[in-house]
């Protein structure tokens, strides 16, 4: 299936940006954005195999960012966004409770945007049998800006994240689960100055009432 889409969006400044805290600015204007997409998807083998490609272009103006005016920090409609790129994904339901999936995205930013990686690759798998289910995935991130204008640009080195989840459905009301995140204990930041947790494991109970 081939699809094309053009959309226009805007975001009004929230009360916090207009009137609260030291960087407030009651004169902020709405952010404006245009988005263009062209996508193609295909299913094979009775729907057990699927894959697709998506091309996009995004242009935005009056983006609200922190700046300086009269010697103080203040929020301003000073930033622009102009991004284009491509995304691809594929999935395969193998059978016997097994399935695998993968996706990749490439992003080109004319004006760097924090927390938006240029390259993102993911591969994962799932297995379910009876009351048990297990899923795992590995994600590679590269070209991630953790800070951008008006701050000095900071670009994170590439890193790999591995997550794992398992669950047991005890009965129709109770499910026990355990989850591990960043099991390779990578050191990385999404926003400059805020390190993300290293290897973390936790579990719990889920009630279905």
Give, region by region, the residue ranges found by the protein language model.
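Outer-membrane beta-barrel signature, preferentially recognizing the C-terminal barrel domain
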Residues: 5-61, 67-93, 113-118, 155-157
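Gram-negative outer-membrane beta-barrel transporters
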Residues: 50-60, 76-148, 173-175, 184
